[in-house]
Design a protein with these regions (language model features):
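Glycine-rich, basic loop-to-helix element that forms the pyrophosphate-binding segment
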Residues: 68-88
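A recurrent flexible, glycine/aromatic-enriched loop bordering the glycosyltransferase active site
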Residues: 151-169, 230-233
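Short beta-strand-to-loop acidic/aromatic patch adjacent to the donor-nucleotide binding site
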Residues: 91-101
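Conserved donor NDP-sugar-binding/catalytic core segment of glycosyltransferases
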Residues: 103, 107-143
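Short, well-formed alpha-helical segments that are part of the catalytic scaffolds
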Residues: 17-30
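A conserved acidic beta->alpha catalytic loop
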Residues: 42-51, 70, 102-103
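Non-catalytic, C-terminal membrane-associated alpha-helical segments of glycosyltransferases
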Residues: 251-315
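A short, conserved alpha-helix in the catalytic core of glycosyltransferases
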Residues: 173, 177-178, 183-211
Length: 315
């Protein structure tokens, strides 16, 4: 009996971004390796998104539209999409996590990543995820460590494949460890999931050639100094979720000591150090950071702070 080739199942989460969804679907239509199946998860239950999905049905051999009753955030949307997808998938298939505002660049990228995934699965049967790039986790500081430019060749072992990096997740691994953790709502979704896969004994890899090309195109080569800045930028809702989720993740992985360090230094120390130079902004950070720290320590998860109504990237 001849086994069928692994299929590609895409999951695309969106919230009030019809123009970007159209661009992303158009890009998927132009891919040399078309998706076998695409599940669009609409957190806004927007008829315009459903209409766009019908218009770009050629983006995949089979396209499905899931309307959510409420905004579950990116993470909750991916969780819903993964749960829906595994029901009709084989263990050897891949689930490709897509972004609604960052279409795949180049018509060959899905084909290249599929080939890379097959190669890594042959070399390392515990391969659970491949993608363009990602990062490694510093458990001592509770921070992401940037992979140096000099490492960007061949297969790069990672702790997680980043957002907007076209993560290919093996269905067998998704079934074993579960989908994304929707409690996070937004922020550090891929980090938590990658760490969960690593804890289960799985491997994750970045594609050095694609990653180097992506950094070069973005003008981000020769930027290996990832030391944190002492200055505060204007507070946005995303910062709340990043801090809350970091504390939650550290506690969930039995690193409460690092969670305390993050709380004291990142949550309170940095805003206090900026009180003189930027009092209004520092006070906003202090107020929202205190809330994020409280929620991260008490497991108050989900959508606890409302996102901005309009994204800066919306047209």
């Amino acid at each position: 009996m001849i086994e069928s080739e692994p299929r590609l199942h895409g999951v695309l989460v969106t919230f009030r971004r019809p123009q970007w969804v159209a661009r992303t679907l158009a890009s998927l239509t132009d891919q040399e390796r078309r998706l076998d199946r695409l599940v669009i998860v609409d957190n806004a239950n927007d008829p315009e998104i459903e209409s766009i999905a019908r218009k770009y049905a050629a983006a995949a051999d089979r396209l499905e539209y899931l309307a959510m009753d409420e905004n579950l955030g990116f993470t909750g949307g991916v969780e819903a999409g993964m749960r829906h997808t595994v029901n009709g998938a084989d263990d050897a298939d891949w689930i490709v996590v897509l972004d609604d505002d960052d279409p795949p660049r180049g018509s060959a990228v899905l084909r290249e990543l599929e080939t890379f995934g097959a190669e890594m699965a042959d070399r390392d049967p515990l391969t659970a995820c491949v993608g363009v790039g990602g990062g490694r986790f510093d458990w001592r500081r509770g921070r992401i460590r940037r992979v140096a430019d000099a490492e960007l060749h061949g297969a790069i072992p990672l702790d997680y494949v980043g957002g907007n990096q076209l993560g290919f997740y093996r269905v067998a691994a998704v079934r074993l460890v579960g989908p994304f953790n929707g409690q996070l709502f937004f922020g550090l979704s891929e980090v938590e999931y990658g760490l969960r896969l690593r804890r289960a004994g799985y491997s994750l890899y970045g594609n050095g050639r694609l990653w180097h090309a992506a950094r070069s195109q973005a003008g981000r080569l020769n930027a290996d100094d990832d030391s944190p800045s002492l200055r505060l930028s204007t507070f946005r809702w995303k910062r709340y979720y990043t801090l809350r989720n970091m504390i939650f993740i550290l506690r969930a992985f039995n690193h409460a000591d690092t969670a305390l360090k993050v709380t004291l230094i990142r949550g309170f120390g940095k805003p206090l150090a900026n009180l003189i130079v930027s009092p209004a902004n520092a006070l906003t950070h202090l107020r929202m950071n205190a809330r994020a720290c409280r929620d991260g320590w008490t497991n108050r998860m989900g959508r606890t702070v409302e996102p901005d109504a309009v994204s800066k990237r919306e047209l």
